[in-house]
Amino acid sequence: GLLEADDPAALSLDLEQLRADLKADPYFKNVPSFQPERGKTAVAFHAKDDLPEVRREVFKLLLRHAVKFYAEVRDMRAVLSYVRERNGRNGTYRYHPNELYDSSVARLFKNRLHQYESCRVCYAVRGSSDRTKSFADSLVLARDRFAKQWDKQVTTAIEVTAAQPVQQAGLQAVDYMLWALQRHYARQESRFLEMVWDKVSLIHAVDETDKAPYGVYYSKTKPLVGAALKNKVGI
């Protein structure tokens, strides 16, 4: 997922202020996730760990900011089918999760980068290895694919940095948007996504290929909530 913020500094300040206000609220005094040693809400917002009362406040805050959310949704059964097909053609092929991650990053940014002279991207650290170069390579691939498809010269300068969510509040914000999307698919619980749908620009369901080989694009004019939700779809 990608969250584009007009003023990331203001978003970070507001999230930090909200967290400080909640920590100072006696209502949360003895809540485990608010204890600093737990490394959860007391340190950074994380939708999976935060209380429902906290989630609602974070979502309300996001609605006040000029942000746009984009996401690529993959059906893991389709990914498994692809892996088996690759293994059938090449017995030495071994799937690695980074392969799916990198290809999703390239898809996600393909139609975004050309809109700007320069682009600063901060991504969340995953695991212990430094994947900044791999992430940057995926962005360059996305930029080049767009240029080739539309026969245009794209010279967008790309700056990539890695951070932990505790270091970059914008990563906490995109985590909330992804959590809302995941709840829709995994639990058919759509109220969170409906609440923030005004901030959603595009959701690409890559493997919903019944009507088109490239999948389905959901947007404000084609809402995801209310669309037929297949049991096989997952993220």
Protein language model features and the residues they cover:
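Phosphate-ester processing/binding pockets and catalytic centers
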Residues: 1-235
